């Protein structure tokens, strides 16, 4: 595939609704696809109910007392969790994707039910970071997460079928434990969520999952972790009539964690003096990335639209990162780097993103992103207030907020501050640890 370094990116159109296309390295993509059984089917629901009628609370107790426990069925936040093999482990589900970890890969499935978009209209998550990476000339390009491959217009019905199979299994297990009548089609969502959340960390319940998941689900896709997120996604009333038919599969490198997961203790272990110094590090790297993007010809319209700590991923950094800006040289000797991720709603230069047209009704620039970013930083890390100079500098981005100008941290009005506003901030003494190679 031709490198995406031109403002006039051209793509072959997909005329047939069933045609598929792979962007990027098809070796990565073919490997991931080879690990998925996208044609898997299960026996009818009535047979599943008949199977569970053979069990009762006493037989469940016997299984819990005697059977093997698979630690990968604990929740990932549980210290007892351990991935035993290279299965696909569910790590998140949001409004715009279902994400799994598999070995050194992150695999994201995105349903595209909106018929007004062609498959090519949904490629921003691959094309925009690739375009930026190919055009940025310095180490700032290392602060972008680029997908290794993206498959367009693939049939994803298997994932919804898998979710339903696991949901029904969990329902039948819970109903048996609670001495309830077995029923998978008429049940209380509130009852299921409450009961599952109460039981999911119990070792006896995890033993039941260890026993039944291989028998009932028979899949290398483990969705037990954060299953409630998947439940809320698929059962949401606004998706009641979705077909869950086709969408995209995106393959990324695996990060250590998202930036919002770092605690005070973790920050110190990473070599920072405090959590506030870590936040300064994150803020400075992302600010420099934006500034360097805005230096590119025709790129002064760049918008990410969802700039927040959990969309900034932390990767290992094997060598110092050096970024030059005017008379300043910023040097980062830290063992990590902060990389911008999730470009699904982004726009830059002449690479059109139809989704952003429906998302934003008025003109915005970088300030829209940073206004939202500062709000989310202050909410995630209230410790910032302990550093008055840093806190005051960030407050400048949100000091004029009212109900008429800002809703849920997002600007409702067009405020087109020049990028020099951000440039002046990063030259302040609060970032002296990294200016002109002074970091150690």
Swiss-Prot record:
EC class (word): transferase
Entry keyword annotation includes Plastid: no
Broad class of the protein's primary localization: host cell
Keywords recorded for this protein, A-Z: ATP-binding, Host endoplasmic reticulum, Kinase, Late protein, Nucleotide-binding, Phosphoprotein, Serine/threonine-protein kinase, Transferase
Gene Ontology terms: cellular component: host cell endoplasmic reticulum; host cell endoplasmic reticulum-Golgi intermediate compartment
Catalytic activity line of the entry: L-seryl-[protein] + ATP = O-phospho-L-seryl-[protein] + ADP + H(+); L-threonyl-[protein] + ATP = O-phospho-L-threonyl-[protein] + ADP + H(+)
Highest taxon, organism lineage: Viruses
Keyword Magnesium set for record: no
Compartments, record wording: Host endoplasmic reticulum; Host endoplasmic reticulum-Golgi intermediate compartment
Residues reported in the UniProt entry to bind ATP: 91-99, 115
Single GO term (MF): protein serine kinase activity
Pfam families listed in its UniProt record: Pox_ser-thr_kin (PF05445)
EC number: 2.7.11.1
PROSITE patterns: PROTEIN_KINASE_ST
Modifications after synthesis and translation: Phosphorylated in vivo. Autophosphorylated in vitro.
Catalytic site positions: 306
Protein kinase domain mapped to chain residues: 85-440
Chain's role: Essential serine-protein kinase involved in the early stage of virion morphogenesis.
Protein family membership: Belongs to the protein kinase superfamily. Ser/Thr protein kinase family. Poxviruses subfamily.
Name of the featured protein: Serine/threonine-protein kinase 2
Annotated organism of origin: Swinepox virus (strain Kasza) (SWPV)
Gene (UniProt): OPG054
């Amino acid at each position: 595939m031709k490198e995406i370094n031109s403002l006039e990116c051209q793509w072959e159109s997909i005329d047939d609704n069933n045609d598929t296309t792979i962007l990027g390295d098809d070796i990565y993509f073919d490997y991931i696809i080879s690990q998925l059984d996208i044609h898997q089917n299960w026996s009818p629901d009535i047979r599943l109910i008949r199977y569970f009628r053979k069990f009762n609370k006493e037989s469940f107790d016997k299984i819990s007392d005697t059977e093997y426990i698979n630690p990968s069925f604990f929740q990932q936040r549980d210290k007892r969790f351990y991935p035993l093999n290279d299965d696909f482990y569910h790590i998140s589900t949001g409004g715009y994707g279902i994400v799994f970890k598999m070995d050194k890969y992150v695999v994201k499935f995105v349903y595209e039910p909106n018929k007004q978009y062609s498959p090519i209209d949904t490629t921003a998550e691959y094309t925009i970071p690739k375009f930026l990476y190919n055009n940025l000339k310095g180490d700032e390009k290392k602060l972008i997460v680029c997908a290794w491959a993206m498959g367009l217009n693939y049939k994803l019905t298997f994932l919804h079928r898998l979710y339903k199979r696991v949901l029904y299994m969990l329902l039948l297990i819970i109903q048996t434990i609670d001495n309830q009548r077995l029923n998978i089609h008429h049940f209380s969502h509130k009852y299921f969520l409450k009961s599952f959340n109460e039981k999911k960390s119990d070792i006896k319940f995890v033993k039941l999952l260890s026993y039944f998941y291989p028998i009932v689900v028979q899949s290398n896709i483990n969705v037990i972790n954060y299953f409630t997120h998947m439940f809320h996604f698929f059962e949401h009333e606004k998706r009641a009539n979705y077909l869950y038919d086709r969408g995209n599969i995106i393959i990324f490198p695996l990060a250590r964690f998202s930036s919002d997961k770092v605690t005070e203790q973790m920050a110190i272990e990473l070599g920072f003096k405090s959590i506030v110094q870590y936040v300064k590090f994150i803020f400075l790297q992302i600010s420099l990335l934006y500034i360097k993007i805005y230096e590119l010809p025709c790129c002064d319209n760049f918008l990410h639209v969802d700039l927040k700590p959990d969309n900034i991923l932390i990767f290992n950094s094997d060598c110092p990162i050096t970024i030059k800006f005017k008379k300043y040289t910023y040097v980062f000797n830290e063992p990590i780097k902060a990389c911008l991720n999730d470009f699904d709603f982004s726009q830059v230069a002449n690479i059109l993103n139809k989704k952003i047209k429906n998302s934003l009704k008025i003109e915005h620039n970088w300030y829209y992103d940073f206004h939202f970013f500062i709000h989310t930083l202050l909410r995630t890390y209230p410790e910032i207030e302990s550093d008055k100079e840093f806190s005051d500098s960030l407050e400048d981005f949100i000091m004029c907020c009212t109900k008429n100008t800002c809703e849920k941290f997002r600007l409702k009005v067009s405020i087109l501050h020049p990028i020099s506003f951000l440039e002046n901030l990063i030259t302040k003494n609060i970032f002296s640890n990294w200016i002109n190679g002074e970091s150690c």
